[in-house]
Amino acid sequence: MTGRATFYYDFNSPYSYLAAERISSLFAEAEIEQPEWQPISFGHLLQTTGRRPWSLPPEGPDPDHLAEIQRRADDRGLPKVVYPEGWPIENYSLNPVRAAVYAKESGRVVSFSLACFRQVFAAGRDMSDVDNVLVAAAACELHPNAVLKGIETKSVKDKLRAATDEALSRGIEGIPTLAVGDELFWGDDKLEEAVAALRRE
């Protein structure tokens, strides 16, 4: 048995947004246990692996990827994808993923993460502005003051670093990735394959 799947993501990734919007329903339809949602630091992942994603200048953002993201959003009835000013570098912050770690401790990681993704890619809000993180927190009934304190705690910072290091140790190089035992399914378009692997168990 592979056990429960783990969904790795960060809020700066539009493909993670697309995956987050449908992963729960895919698992529910397949009648398999919902995955663990695990926020990680994409920035640390890239620094460690040396990978250069499609979204980074000077070559990126790649217009083909942007068009594909919008096509998928349209096909799934999602709002027009809006990128915050300064995306993907200038607005990158650890505060949203730290807040997600805090939300996980409170049992609200899924609702917070969806609220945060929608702030970024449906509303185009800059999540390096902590006030926008707190809007997402309030949307899932997390007290903004508690979140503000939580993201500064050593415990939350250590858990985020440990989760990112674990992702690296599993061979994860990009997000979103769904880990099913030793198998890694990298990309929004790989979710169905991951579900099929779980159903074979």
What residues fall within each predicted segment?
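Structural alpha/beta surface segment adjacent to cysteine/selenocysteine redox centers
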Residues: 15-120
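C-terminal cap of thioredoxin/glutaredoxin-like
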Residues: 3-6, 11-33, 37, 115-201
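A structural signal for the main folded, soluble domain(s) of proteins
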Residues: 1, 85-87, 155
